[in-house]
Amino acid sequence: MLKPLGNRVIIERKEQEQTTKSGIVLTDSAKEKSNEGIVVAVGTGRVLDNGEKVAPEVKEGDRVVFQEYAGSEVKRGDKTYLILNVEDLLAIIED
């Protein structure tokens, strides 16, 4: 498993739908990458100038929305994860 350092999180990106609302089946090249995902690991947080540590606002299992072109993709086995800074998270999805 990957363990993020500092103020980073690891996201498992939500899969895009295979078909459109009108029933058209999309190929992998036609699908846009989703900017939603599940937090699978959280780093220890950031350190302020005064030495105080601030923990990230998200936790493992949170569904989040992140900036479209943020982060770096990393493959582990058959899964692809996205490592990004907490600042690149835009919202937590609450249902």
From Swiss-Prot:
<dbReference type="InterPro" id="IPR020818">
    <property type="entry name" value="Chaperonin_GroES"/>
</dbReference>
<keyword id="KW-0143">Chaperone</keyword>
<dbReference type="GO" id="GO:0051085">
    <property type="term" value="P:chaperone cofactor-dependent protein refolding"/>
</dbReference>
<comment type="subunit">
    <text>Heptamer of 7 subunits arranged in a ring. Interacts with the chaperonin GroEL.</text>
</comment>
<dbReference type="GO" id="GO:0046872">
    <property type="term" value="F:metal ion binding"/>
</dbReference>
<dbReference type="GO" id="GO:0005524">
    <property type="term" value="F:ATP binding"/>
</dbReference>
<dbReference type="GO" id="GO:0051082">
    <property type="term" value="F:unfolded protein binding"/>
</dbReference>
<dbReference type="InterPro" id="IPR018369">
    <property type="entry name" value="Chaprnonin_Cpn10_CS"/>
</dbReference>
<dbReference type="GO" id="GO:0051087">
    <property type="term" value="F:protein-folding chaperone binding"/>
</dbReference>
<protein>
    <recommendedName>
        <fullName>Co-chaperonin GroES</fullName>
    </recommendedName>
</protein>
<dbReference type="Pfam" id="PF00166">
    <property type="entry name" value="Cpn10"/>
</dbReference>
<dbReference type="InterPro" id="IPR037124">
    <property type="entry name" value="Chaperonin_GroES_sf"/>
</dbReference>
<keyword id="KW-0963">Cytoplasm</keyword>
<comment type="similarity">
    <text>Belongs to the GroES chaperonin family.</text>
</comment>
<comment type="function">
    <text>Together with the chaperonin GroEL, plays an essential role in assisting protein folding. The GroEL-GroES system forms a nano-cage that allows encapsulation of the non-native substrate proteins and provides a physical environment optimized to promote and accelerate protein folding. GroES binds to the apical surface of the GroEL ring, thereby capping the opening of the GroEL channel.</text>
</comment>
<dbReference type="InterPro" id="IPR011032">
    <property type="entry name" value="GroES-like_sf"/>
</dbReference>
<dbReference type="GO" id="GO:0005737">
    <property type="term" value="C:cytoplasm"/>
</dbReference>
<dbReference type="GO" id="GO:0044183">
    <property type="term" value="F:protein folding chaperone"/>
</dbReference>
